[in-house]
C-alpha cells in the first residue's frame, strides 16, 4: 500500500515504511476513536481506505492520508450497534458489512463529495430484503451485487437501491419455496449459486433464467471452485466433495465412505493452487487432504504438530 506495509494486530494497527513502525491505537487522551484495539480483519478499498473489523464486532474506516478513524455506521446511527462478522469489499468500491442477525449494510463512498459515506440496511426489518442472514455478497462482471442469503438471492443493479429477488419466501406467498445460498462461481455466460440438498442454480446471463443442477447428496454445498474450463470442484458440509463437468453434466463423488484418505470431517474450505490441485481444510488437527484432478487421487498429508 503506497510503499507501506500495514498489519492488523491485537493492539491496534501498525504501519511499516521500510525503516520504522508506527502504531495506531486508542489511548487515553488521544484522538483515535477505535472502539477496541484488537483488530481481527483489515481490507483496502479501491479509494485507498482501510476497513477494520475489531474484536467487538464494530467496523472502522481508516484514512492513511489524514491518519483518522471513523466508525461505520457512525455511533448513534441506525446499524451502529449491529454485530458485524464479515467485511466484503467489492471491485467498484462498494463495501458490504454482514451482520449476525440484522442482514447486511451496503456502504457507498462518494469520492466527489470528500469521500462522504452513505449506507442502506438490507434486512427484513427495513423491508429492503426479506432476510436477516446474508452469507456472502458477489459482484458480477456486469457490476451487479448478488446477496446470498438464508431466504433466496437478491440482485442489485448498478446505481440502484432496490434488489430483484429470486427464490425468496414472503408472507402468504410461495410458502416453502425459499432456499438458502452459500457459495458462488461466475463464468463468462453463467453464474452458479450453491444451495442445500446438492442443488446448484445456474443463472444464464443472456436470458436471465435459472437452470437447476442436482448432485446426488443431501448435504449443503459450501464452495465451488473452477479447476478446468468446464470442470469445478464442489465441496459439501457433510458428504465430501464432487467434481462436476458443466458441459457434459457429469459428476464424480469423493465421499468419506468411498475415499479412505479423506478425513470423515466437514470440509471448512478449499484452495486451488496454480497447478489446479485442490487442498482441503477440515476439522482434523494436523491433517490436510490433497486432491489431484489429473489422476483423481486424494492423499492425506500429515503435518507434525
What is each PLM-predicted segment?
Residues 1-305:
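Carboxylate-rich, polar loop motifs that coordinate divalent cations or form catalytic acidic clusters
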Amino acid at each position: 500500500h503506497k510503499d507501506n506495509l500495514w498489519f492488523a494486530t491485537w493492539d491496534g494497527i501498525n504501519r511499516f515504511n521500510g525503516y520504522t513502525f508506527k502504531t495506531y491505537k486508542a489511548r487515553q487522551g488521544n484522538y483515535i476513536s477505535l472502539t477496541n484495539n484488537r483488530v481481527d480483519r483489515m481490507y483496502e478499498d479501491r479509494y485507498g481506505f482501510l476497513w477494520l473489523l475489531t474484536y467487538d464486532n464494530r467496523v472502522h474506516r481508516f484514512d492513511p492520508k489524514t491518519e483518522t478513524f471513523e466508525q461505520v455506521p457512525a455511533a448513534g446511527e441506525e446499524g451502529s450497534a449491529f454485530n458485524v462478522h464479515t467485511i466484503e469489499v467489492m471491485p467498484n468500491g462498494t463495501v458490504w458489512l454482514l451482520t449476525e442477525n440484522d442482514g447486511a449494510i451496503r456502504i457507498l463512498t462518494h469520492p466527489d463529495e470528500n469521500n462522504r459515506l452513505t449506507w442502506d440496511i438490507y434486512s427484513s426489518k427495513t423491508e429492503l430484503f426479506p432476510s436477516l442472514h446474508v452469507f456472502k455478497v458477489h459482484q458480477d462482471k456486469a457490476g451487479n451485487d448478488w446477496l446470498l442469503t438464508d431466504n433466496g438471492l437478491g440482485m442489485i443493479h448498478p446505481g440502484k437501491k432496490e434488489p430483484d429477488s429470486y427464490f425468496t419466501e414472503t408472507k402468504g406467498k410461495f410458502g416453502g419455496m425459499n432456499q438458502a445460498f452459500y457459495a458462488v462461481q461466475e463464468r463468462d455466460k453463467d453464474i452458479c449459486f450453491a444451495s442445500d440438498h446438492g442443488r446448484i442454480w445456474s443463472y444464464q446471463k443472456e436470458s436471465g433464467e435459472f437452470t437447476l443442477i442436482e448432485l446426488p447428496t443431501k448435504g449443503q454445498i459450501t464452495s465451488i471452485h473452477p479447476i478446468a474450463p468446464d470442470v469445478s470442484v464442489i465441496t459439501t458440509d457433510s458428504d465430501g466433495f464432487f467434481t462436476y463437468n458443466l458441459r457434459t453434466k457429469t459428476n464424480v463423488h469423493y465421499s468419506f465412505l468411498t475415499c479412505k484418505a479423506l478425513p470423515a470431517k466437514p470440509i471448512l474450505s478449499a484452495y486451488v493452487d496454480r497447478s489446479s490441485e485442490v487442498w482441503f481444510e477440515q476439522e482434523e488437527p494436523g491433517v490436510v487432504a490433497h486432491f489431484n484432478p489429473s489422476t483423481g487421487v486424494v492423499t492425506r498429508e500429515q503435518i507434525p504438530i
